[in-house]
A protein has these predicted regions:
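DUTPase catalytic domain/fold
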Residues: 1-97
């Protein structure tokens, strides 16, 4: 098991969580939306064919030789058609930003 360090950049950010000890990765939580006004604290409307940037409010240190992968949750992808714009987000171990 590899250790990934997460750092919250604001107090109101949710740290990533793991669904179980056998989970393949961590669940990320939305913190803010770029160029978009949410309907309320829990609802965001993405128009058909539209895109929004969703920030997590965290930074992380990925161990050398590994990468961070951002994938759509299966339920959102199949039921709602929501997925990262490029389908898979790749974060290199040496990326800082």
């Amino acid at each position: 098991m590899y250790n990934v360090d997460f750092k919250k950049i604001r107090k109101d950010v949710h740290r990533p969580t793991r669904g179980s000890i056998e989970a393949a990765g961590w669940d990320l939580y939305a913190w803010s939306y770029e160029n978009h006004d949410p309907v309320d604290d829990w609802t965001v409307i993405v128009p058909p064919g539209g895109q929004i940037k969703i920030r997590t409010g965290i930074c992380m240190s990925i161990p050398s030789g590994l990468f961070g992968g951002i994938y759509a949750r299966s339920g959102l992808a199949t039921k709602k058609g929501l997925a990262p714009a490029n389908k898979v987000g790749v974060i290199d171990a040496d990326y800082r930003g």
